[in-house]
Amino acid sequence: MAVRSKSSKAWLHEHINDQYVHMAQKDGYRARAAYKLLEINEKDKIIKPGTVLADLGSAPGSWSQVAAKLTGTSGAVFALDILPMEAIGGVSFIQGDFRENDVLAQFETLLDNRPLDLVICDMAPNMSGNAVSDQARSFYLCELALDFASQHLKTGGSFLVKVFQGAGYQEYMAAMREIFGTVQTRKPEASRNRSSEIYLLGKNKR
């Protein structure tokens, strides 16, 4: 218990002193993760006015907030999560598991035959503390997201996903390269240095 308590105190200290936490509070974003997407988009311009995108594992909603601002009224943002999410202007939210037929049917109805330009995914499992198990569960979610992207993205579309480097990383990269013309890595400044998280950006879906 002492180790857990010490770790929790260290996390709380880091959180309180985190510039991105303060920026998120000031700018009205629900989580510091908003700045990761903003930085990636500044470089890669994957979201612009008119973009039609799906945000998988969207709660609490910071990526959907960013996406709604960047797509504007001419675009569309569809957010999906099994967890509840407070409403965001310009975002269509579906609560449910995106593997399930009824959820997919809702999504396809809202999409209304529009081409899907982009899928973004910042999902991570609830961590158990078992590194091997957590890594496996993380890549399972990533595989589900890749499957969704491969089925729903238009030809030429893009896919941005958070992964954790370690077991399964190279295999996942290889799977993405089979689906996308290019796959690039991104490590935004807003990612904590100690984190093994990295973002993979697949462009030009085959």
UniProtKB/Swiss-Prot annotation:
Reaction(s) catalysed (UniProt annotation): uridine(2552) in 23S rRNA + S-adenosyl-L-methionine = 2'-O-methyluridine(2552) in 23S rRNA + S-adenosyl-L-homocysteine + H(+)
Enzyme Commission number(s) of this protein: 2.1.1.166
GO molecular function: rRNA (uridine-2'-O-)-methyltransferase activity
Organism superkingdom: Bacteria
Class of the enzyme per the UniProt entry, highest EC level: transferase
Coiled coil: none
Catalytic residues of the enzyme: K162
Residue positions binding S-adenosyl-L-methionine: G61, W63, D81, D97, D122
Keyword list, A-Z: Cytoplasm, Methyltransferase, rRNA processing, S-adenosyl-L-methionine, Transferase
Family annotation (Pfam families): FtsJ
Cellular-component GO terms for this entry: cytoplasm
Compartment(s) where it occurs, according to its Swiss-Prot or TrEMBL record: Cytoplasm
PANTHER family: RIBOSOMAL RNA METHYLTRANSFERASE, RRNA METHYLTRANSFERASE 2, MITOCHONDRIAL
Family membership noted in the UniProt record: Belongs to the class I-like SAM-binding methyltransferase superfamily. RNA methyltransferase RlmE family.
Its job: Specifically methylates the uridine in position 2552 of 23S rRNA at the 2'-O position of the ribose in the fully assembled 50S ribosomal subunit.
Protein name per its UniProtKB record: Ribosomal RNA large subunit methyltransferase E
Gene for this chain: rlmE
